């Protein structure tokens, strides 16, 4: 493992409408089978819908707040010590926490059946911005799991 080459971060892909790296990443998370233009339409429609009820001037404010609220601060990773596997709580890298938050928001939007994707994504973004919804519940579950396994924190590596 140690002899492998260093992996560098990719250059961020910004979206054309808002020139935002955050929205660009969200579009990539929504995209399936390489259909970027469809993913862009879904995300832009969701941002417009999520921003309708707010008095915010900046349309990205709602989505930024939603991702901030869904970001996990700690997570657990399995660590094998002497025949036993422990769930060890670790702090999450900022890039990973942002990625997890977006993944959770998109996945829970996809799981809402009977609703078009742009509406489901808009609802999930609105709820996450208000500290509610499935993605925030998932973050709380991850935090509870880390809290419950705090005794194994000394196994950090």
Curated annotation (Swiss-Prot):
UniProt-listed GO biological process terms: translation
UniProt-listed SUPFAM superfamilies: Ribosomal protein S7
Pfam families referenced in this protein's UniProt entry, alphabetically: Ribosomal_S7
Keywords attached to this entry: Ribonucleoprotein, Ribosomal protein, RNA-binding, rRNA-binding, tRNA-binding
Stretches that traverse the bilayer: none
InterPro entries: Ribosomal_uS7 (IPR000235), Ribosomal_uS7_bac/org-type (IPR005717), Ribosomal_uS7_CS (IPR020606), Ribosomal_uS7_dom (IPR023798), Ribosomal_uS7_dom_sf (IPR036823)
Gene3D superfamilies from the UniProt entry: Ribosomal protein S7 domain
NCBIfam families named among the record's database cross-references: rpsG_bact
Family to which this protein belongs: Belongs to the universal ribosomal protein uS7 family.
Subunit and partners: Part of the 30S ribosomal subunit. Contacts proteins S9 and S11.
Protein's job: One of the primary rRNA binding proteins, it binds directly to 16S rRNA where it nucleates assembly of the head domain of the 30S subunit. Is located at the subunit interface close to the decoding center, probably blocks exit of the E-site tRNA.
Xref: HAMAP family: Ribosomal_uS7_B
The protein's name: Small ribosomal subunit protein uS7
Source lineage: Bacteria, Pseudomonadati, Verrucomicrobiota, Verrucomicrobiia, Verrucomicrobiales
């Amino acid at each position: 493992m140690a002899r492998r080459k260093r992996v560098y971060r990719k250059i961020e892909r910004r979206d054309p409408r808002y020139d935002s790296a955050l929205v660009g990443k969200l579009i990539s998370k929504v995209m399936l089978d390489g259909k970027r233009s469809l993913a862009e339409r879904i995300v832009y429609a969701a941002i417009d819908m999520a921003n309708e009820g707010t008095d915010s001037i900046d349309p990205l404010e709602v989505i930024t707040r939603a991702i901030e609220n869904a970001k996990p601060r700690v997570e657990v990773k399995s660590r094998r010590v002497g025949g036993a596997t422990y769930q060890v709580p670790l702090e999450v890298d900022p890039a990973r926490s942002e990625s997890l938050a977006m993944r959770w928001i998109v996945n829970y939007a996809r799981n809402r059946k009977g609703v078009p994707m742009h509406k489901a994504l808009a609802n999930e973004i609105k709820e996450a911005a208000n500290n509610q919804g499935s993605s925030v519940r998932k973050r709380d579950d991850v935090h509870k799991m880390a809290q419950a396994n705090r005794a194994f924190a000394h196994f950090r590596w």
